[in-house]
């Protein structure tokens, strides 16, 4: 498969040959709602194939087809029922926005101070992420998106809520002194298409 990358990794005294698929996630064939599952060293457990995790790591978690986290004691029952279970190690995704810059005739405006007011992030087939706003010399505050929107078609009981849309959040601070970070430590997918911001700027000087 030309979409696969094989990596030989040495961990301690052991060598591991691991594969990364850069194409469509195979998990979409089995999960309820056809969503991907994001785990490091992920393996697929099923009765007709691998039934135990081929490595030892205390951080390993197990995910059922509905996207829920299940204990190790429930894995055998899921496999006996003909379901697929995914196992792997959670990791943290982070993305920090670059500083917004006002431009005129494709040149930055350096005679004004830009203050941010709002951000809007367009997400696609996403189940979880957090937004961290870190203003200089002020406390960090966090907003969390869980995919569960009141009245939304994806908000189904006992199912992972995977949704697409626009998430808006407030940002009050100087553009050059405020860090805005998207973050997710969940196994549920998060994908972002674009973002836009709203603010106001104040001229520091004016020619007479």
Sequence positions of predicted segments:
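Beta-sheet repeat architectures centered on beta-propellers
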Residues: 1-208
């Amino acid at each position: 498969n030309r979409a696969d990358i094989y990596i030989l990794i040495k961990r301690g005294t052991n060598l591991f040959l691991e594969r990364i698929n850069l194409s469509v996630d195979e998990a979409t064939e089995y999960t309820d709602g056809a969503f991907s599952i994001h785990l490091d060293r992920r393996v697929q457990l099923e009765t007709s194939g691998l039934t135990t995790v081929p490595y030892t790591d205390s951080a390993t978690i197990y995910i059922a087809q509905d996207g829920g986290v299940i204990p190790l004691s429930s894995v055998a029952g899921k496999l006996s029922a003909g379901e697929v279970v995914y196992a792997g190690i959670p990791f943290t995704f982070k993305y920090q926005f670059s500083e917004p810059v006002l431009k005129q005739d494709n040149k930055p405006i350096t005679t004004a101070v830009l203050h941010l007011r709002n951000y809007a992030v367009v997400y696609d087939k996403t189940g979880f992420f957090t937004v961290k706003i870190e203003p200089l010399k002020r406390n960090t505050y966090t907003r969390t998106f869980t995919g569960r929107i009141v009245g939304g078609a994806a908000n189904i009981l006992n199912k992972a809520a995977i949704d697409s849309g626009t998430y808006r959040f407030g940002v009050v601070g100087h553009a050059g002194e405020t860090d805005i970070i998207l973050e997710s430590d969940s196994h549920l997918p998060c994908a972002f298409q674009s973002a836009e911001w709203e603010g106001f700027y104040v001229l520091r000087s004016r020619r007479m």
